[in-house]
């Protein structure tokens, strides 16, 4: 039983590696897309996007910080 489990785990790892190396674009493989989304998440960006607060973080290019002093947002 343990041999079968090991063979299955190795097969799954091999198939996953094949999908990663043969995908033509990153959009084809979900795990790559997910890691990119985490990397580009709001907490790791240097600027605030449209609709996000800009009190402590500057707005991204092309956006302007507007609104009341207590809670301005990027527009």
Swiss-Prot record:
Pro-peptide positions on chain: 24-45
Disulfide pattern: 47-60, 54-65, 59-74
Composition bias type Basic and acidic residues, residue spans: 31-45
Expression sites (tissue/organ): Expressed by the venom duct.
Cellular component GO terms, alphabetical: extracellular region
Transmembrane parts of this sequence: none
Annotated localization: Secreted
Signal peptide: 1-23
Protein name per the record: Conotoxin VnMKLT2-012
Domain topic, free-text comment: The presence of a 'disulfide through disulfide knot' structurally defines this protein as a knottin. The cysteine framework is VI/VII (C-C-CC-C-C).
Protein family: Belongs to the conotoxin O1 superfamily.
Molecular-function annotations in GO: ion channel inhibitor activity; toxin activity
InterPro entries the record matches: Conotoxin
Annotated region described as Disordered, given as residue ranges: 31-50
UniProt keyword list: Disulfide bond, Knottin, Neurotoxin, Secreted, Signal, Toxin
């Amino acid at each position: 039983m343990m041999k079968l489990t090991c063979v299955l785990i190795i097969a799954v790892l091999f198939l996953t590696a094949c999908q990663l190396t043969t995908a033509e674009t990153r959009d084809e493989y979900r795990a790559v897309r997910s890691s990119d989304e985490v990397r580009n998440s709001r907490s790791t960006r240097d600027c605030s996007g449209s609709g996000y607060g800009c009190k402590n973080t500057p707005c991204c290019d092309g956006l302007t910080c507007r609104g009341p002093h207590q809670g301005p947002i990027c527009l």
